[in-house]
A protein has these predicted regions:
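Short, well-ordered loop/turn elements at secondary-structure boundaries
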Residues: 108, 128-129, 136
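Residue-level signal for cytosolic alpha-helical hairpin/rod architecture
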Residues: 27, 107, 117, 199-203, ...
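Membrane-helix interface/capping residues of multi-pass secondary transporters
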Residues: 10, 52, 119-120, 128, ...
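Helix-loop-helix module between adjacent transmembrane segments
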Residues: 10-115, 187-195
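Hydrophobic alpha-helical segments of secondary membrane carriers
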Residues: 61-65, 126, 221-222
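Loop-to-helix junctions at membrane interfaces in multi-pass transport proteins
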Residues: 2-14, 47, 92-100, 132-260
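Transmembrane helix irregularities
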Residues: 116-117, 136
C-alpha cells in the first residue's frame, strides 16, 4: 500500500477506510447470525444453508484465493522488508531475487509451524501483541519521516508535505487512478465484505470469542484501528516520495524509509 501511495498518492487509502465499514457489517449483521446457528466455519454455514456440493466449491475457491491472491502478497512484502532491513542477500552473497525467494520460503514455513503447533489461541494472543506493536511502531515511522523531511522539525515536515507535490494528498481518485472514487463505494465494498465477513482466516477469530458481545467488540476495535491505516501505511509512501524520488521500485518505499 505504501508503494501504491508512492506512485499514485493518497487515493489508495480507500481500500483501508472501506474495510472499517465492512467490519461494522461483520459485528452487527454477520457475526450474530453465525453464532446463532452455532457455525464453526464459513463452509459449515454454506453447507447448512445450501448443500455439501456448495461447500466443496466454496472451499476450493477460498483455497485458490488464499494461495493466489493473499499469501503471495503477504510473503513478498514480508520478505522485501526483511531483506531491506537485514541485507540478507549481501550477507549470504546471493542475488536480490534469490534472497527474496529464500525469505518467502522461510516465512511460509515459520507461519505453518506457528499455526500447527500453537493453534488458534496462540494466533489470537500473538495477533493482540503484534497489533499493539504495529500501531505504536507504525505511527513512529511517519513521525520520524516528517522530522527527516523538515530537517529536524516535525512542523516543517508537515508544511513541506502539504505544500510540495500537494496533489499527492488528493484522496479522491480520478478515472486513471488505481482506485477511482466510484469503485471505492461500489465494487470495493463488495470485495471487502467478502474478505472481512466471510474469509475463514478473519471470521474464525470472532467465532472463537467467549460471547457475541466480545466478538463484536473485537470486530469494532479492528474497524477503529483500520482507520489508522492511512497514517501507518499510506502516509509513509508519500513521505518516501518526497525523500527518495528515484527509487527503482515503488515497493521499496516503505523499507527504504524505515531503513534510513
Amino acid at each position: 500500500l505504501s508503494g501504491q501511495a508512492y506512485k499514485s498518492g493518497m487515493s489508495v487509502m480507500g481500500r483501508e477506510v472501506t474495510s472499517a465499514v465492512t467490519l461494522i457489517f461483520l459485528a452487527l449483521i454477520f457475526l450474530p447470525r453465525y453464532l446463532k446457528r452455532g457455525i464453526a466455519t464459513i463452509p459449515d454455514f454454506l453447507e447448512e444453508r445450501y448443500d455439501k456440493t456448495t461447500r466443496i466449491i466454496i472451499d476450493f475457491c477460498f483455497l485458490i484465493a488464499t494461495g493466489v491472491c493473499f499469501l503471495p502478497i503477504v510473503l513478498y512484502s514480508g520478505a522485501l522488508a526483511l531483506n531491506s532491513l537485514f541485507h540478507v542477500g549481501e550477507s549470504l552473497q546471493i542475488s536480490h531475487g534469490a534472497a527474496i525467494w529464500l525469505l518467502v520460503i522461510l516465512l511460509g514455513l515459520a507461519g505453518i509451524l506457528y499455526a500447527v503447533i500453537g493453534g488458534l489461541r496462540a494466533m489470537a494472543v500473538a495477533d493482540s501483541i503484534n497489533g499493539i506493536g504495529l500501531v505504536i511502531g507504525g505511527l513512529m515511522v511517519p513521525v520520524f519521516g516528517l522530522i527527516a523531511m523538515g530537517k529536524g522539525s516535525f512542523m516543517q515536515g508537515i508544511e513541506q508535505l502539504t505544500t510540495v507535490h500537494a496533489e499527492k494528498l488528493n484522496s479522491i481518485g480520478g478515472p486513471t487512478d488505481p482506485l477511482p472514487i466510484g469503485a471505492a463505494f461500489t465494487g470495493l465494498i463488495l470485495v471487502n465484505t467478502f474478505y472481512w465477513c466471510t474469509n475463514q482466516g478473519i471470521v474464525q477469530r470472532t467465532l472463537a470469542s467467549k460471547s457475541l458481545a466480545e466478538g463484536q467488540k473485537g470486530a469494532l476495535l479492528t474497524a477503529v484501528l483500520k482507520m489508522l491505516d492511512p497514517l501507518v501505511l499510506v502516509l509513509p509512501g508519500l513521505i518516501a516520495f518526497h525523500l527518495y524520488q528515484d527509487l527503482p521500485k515503488a515497493d521499496m518505499a516503505y523499507p527504504t524509509l524505515v531503513n534510513n
